[in-house]
Amino acid sequence: MVLEEGEESCLLISRYALEELKYHGRKEPVTWETSGLRAWLNREFLDMAFSPEEQSAIRITEVDNSLGNPVFHTEGGNNTEDRVFLLSREEVMTYFPSEGERLCEPTLHSKRASLAGYSHWWTRSPGSMPYYADYINYRGAVISQNVDNKFTAIRPVIRVMTEYLHREE
């Protein structure tokens, strides 16, 4: 799903909620920079989901984590440089302004979905406590939960070279 299209690159997000994973392996203070999920997305997921040719078209993106969580005033940590990342709480509100637009169906591979048929999905933003992260629930609301919750899916975001998307095969 295209979030932004520019001359040089396009910002894409998974249309579906993919794998359900913990944001971090333990319930401890963590930011996007130090999260287990960030490490997994930029290593195992990148290698598993994309061919070498596709990986060469994915740009490194400077990910701004400076805002943290403006509602709970929790620190966002340092900015990062990632090939795969998650949207922040604020970016979710920008790209998906209404709760209905934030609803996300799971893939068949995803383990769980709510009775309404939609998945919870992580943001990269910290939650109400240093060991919480924000996620979007099955109703499209932004909520905080423990970083070691394993029943929340991911919607990876990548920035891809525009010429790669529009190439002739």
Tell where the protein language model's regions lie, with residue ranges.
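Collagenous Gly-X-Y triple-helix signature in extracellular proteins
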Residues: 1-169
